[in-house]
Amino acid sequence: MVRPRKLFAQHWLKSEKALDAIVKAAECSTNDRILEIGPGTGILTRRLLPAVQSLVAVEIDRDLCELLAKQLGKKENFLLLQGDFLTIDLAANLGSFPKFQKPNKVVANIPYNITGPIIEKLLGTISNPNLEPFDSIVLLIQKEVAERLYAKSGSRTFGALSVRVQYLADCEFICDVPASAFHPPPKVDSAVVRLRPRQIEIPVNDPKRLENLVKLGFGAKRKMLRNNLQSVVDRDRLSQLLEQLNINPQARAEDISTQQWVKLANLLGVE
C-alpha cells in the first residue's frame, strides 16, 4: 500500500458518506467524459468509472501511478496520465486517445495547497476565460476556501477570489466533510463544492481593468473602497459612481457584488 506523502499534500478520503455526496453532485451519465485530478489510490475513481463514458486521471505521484495502472489499467474507459496537472498539456496528451478527448466534467479531491491555481486552470481568468468550459466542476477542497467561492457580498468571507470565480461560474455548496473523513486527517475541515461555468450576465468591457480594480479594491479589505481605488479614480468621482450604482459611498470591497464590480469597471471605462 502506498503511504500518503507530505510532499504532495496527500490525504486519502475514506468516508463513504463523502464519496456518495461527491458522486451524486457530479450527476454522471454514460455520456460524460470525466477529468479527475489527483486520483490517489483510486477510491473515487472506482465509484465513477461504471457510470461514465470515460475517465482520464492526472496523477503526479509515480508510485500511485504504478498502483492505479496495476489495479485499473485494464478498464477500457480509464486513462491515466502521469504528471503535474498545473503544467501538463491535457489536449496534447489526449490527442492520440479520441475516446478521452475534451472531458466535459471535472470531479476531484484536489491538493489544498494548490487549490487556487487548479481552479484558475479549469475556469481561466476574467481576462482569459476557458473558451471550452466544462459542464460542471465538483471539487473537495478546504472548507475555508470553499466558503470564499460561494460567499455573498456583504459577508466576511467575500473577497477577490469570490469575484474572480463568480464572474465565470455559479458556485454551489454541497456538503461539509470533517477532517476525520481522511487518512491521515488534515489540520482543517473540508467541503464539497460544485462550479458551473456559465455565460457572463453582464460582460465587462475591459477585463484587465476589472481584474485590476478587484485586486486594488481588496488590497486593504477593511478600508473603504474609495480609499483603496484612489490610485485609479478620484475619491469624489468614485463616490458619485457608487451612488449611481446605488452603492453606499462608504462601502468596502466586500460589500459590492460581482455584478456591481463589473458595472463599476464599465463606468470607469467611459470616463
UniProtKB/Swiss-Prot annotation:
Source superkingdom: Bacteria
HAMAP family named among the record's database cross-references: 16SrRNA_methyltr_A (MF_00607)
GO MF assignments: 16S rRNA (adenine(1518)-N(6)/adenine(1519)-N(6))-dimethyltransferase activity; RNA binding
UniProt family annotation: Belongs to the class I-like SAM-binding methyltransferase superfamily. rRNA adenine N(6)-methyltransferase family. RsmA subfamily.
Chain's role: Specifically dimethylates two adjacent adenosines (A1518 and A1519) in the loop of a conserved hairpin near the 3'-end of 16S rRNA in the 30S particle. May play a critical role in biogenesis of 30S subunits.
Main location: cytoplasm
One Pfam family per UniProt: RrnaAD
Record's keyword terms, sorted: Cytoplasm, Methyltransferase, RNA-binding, rRNA processing, S-adenosyl-L-methionine, Transferase
This protein's encoding gene: rsmA
Top-tier EC class: transferase
UniProt-recorded name of the protein: Ribosomal RNA small subunit methyltransferase A
Positions contributing to S-adenosyl-L-methionine binding: H11, L13, G38, E59, D84, N109
PROSITE patterns registered for this protein in UniProt: RRNA_A_DIMETH, SAM_RNA_A_N6_MT
CDD domains xrefs: AdoMet_MTases (cd02440)
Compartment(s) of residence: Cytoplasm
A cellular component term, taken from the record's GO annotations: cytosol
Catalysed reactions listed for this entry: adenosine(1518)/adenosine(1519) in 16S rRNA + 4 S-adenosyl-L-methionine = N(6)-dimethyladenosine(1518)/N(6)-dimethyladenosine(1519) in 16S rRNA + 4 S-adenosyl-L-homocysteine + 4 H(+)
EC identifiers of the protein: 2.1.1.182
